[in-house]
């Protein structure tokens, strides 16, 4: 089973396309929707829904993945639920990048203070990071510097922030999921 979390643009037709692409490596792909506007509520909702999906699935190696803000949530929720994660162009600091876009971006900061201390060290090797060199939203060199001590990083030379085409990375995802 693969759980897919969308980014900030939850209505993008690209989300459906990514789900279809993921079905090439696992027929059981679950799209979990969340508001993107209420971080504390989103975290509670995602924890509940991901936990429920894991319980319903017979997959011994479930995986959670997401793009942008979905990458932020995939890393945290995947860690808390004990499943591997694949994150594309993750928004590592929504408390900064979401200012002016949502009412309470400071809730992300509150979430990070309540998260397990040094969770990345405890999550080491359980997350695959795929970064685009053409990301027009985030500086992925900084993202790589922040994550490289904990996770393997794969660079993509053609995709933009929304990562429309994940197909080039499906086999790496499949191998990571099975490992």
UniProtKB/Swiss-Prot annotation:
Domain of life of the native organism: Bacteria
One of the Pfam families matching this protein, by short name: UPF0227
Cited Gene3D superfamilies: alpha/beta hydrolase
GO molecular-function terms, A-Z: hydrolase activity, acting on ester bonds
Annotated GO CC locations: cytosol
UniProt xrefs under HAMAP family: UPF0227
Family listed: Belongs to the UPF0227 family.
The protein's name: UPF0227 protein VC_1892
Organism: Vibrio cholerae serotype O1 (strain ATCC 39315 / El Tor Inaba N16961)
């Amino acid at each position: 089973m693969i759980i897919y979390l969308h980014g900030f643009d939850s209505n993008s037709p690209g989300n459906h396309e990514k789900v279809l692409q993921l079905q090439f490596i696992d027929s059981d792909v679950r799209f979990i929707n969340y508001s993107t506007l209420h971080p504390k509520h989103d975290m509670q909702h995602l924890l509940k829904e991901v936990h429920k999906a894991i319980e319903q699935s017979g997959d011994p190696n479930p995986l959670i993945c997401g793009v942008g803000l979905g990458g932020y949530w995939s890393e945290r929720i995947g860690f808390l639920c004990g499943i591997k994660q694949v994150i594309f162009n993750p928004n590592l600091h929504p408390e900064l990048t979401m200012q002016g876009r949502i009412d309470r971006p400071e809730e992300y900061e509150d979430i990070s203070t309540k998260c397990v201390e040094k969770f990345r060290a405890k999550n080491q090797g359980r997350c695959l990071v795929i970064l685009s060199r053409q990301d027009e939203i985030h500086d992925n060199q900084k993202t790589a510097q922040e994550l490289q001590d904990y996770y393997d990083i794969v660079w993509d030379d053609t995709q933009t922030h929304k990562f429309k085409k994940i197909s080039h990375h499906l086999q790496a995802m499949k191998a990571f999921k099975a490992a």
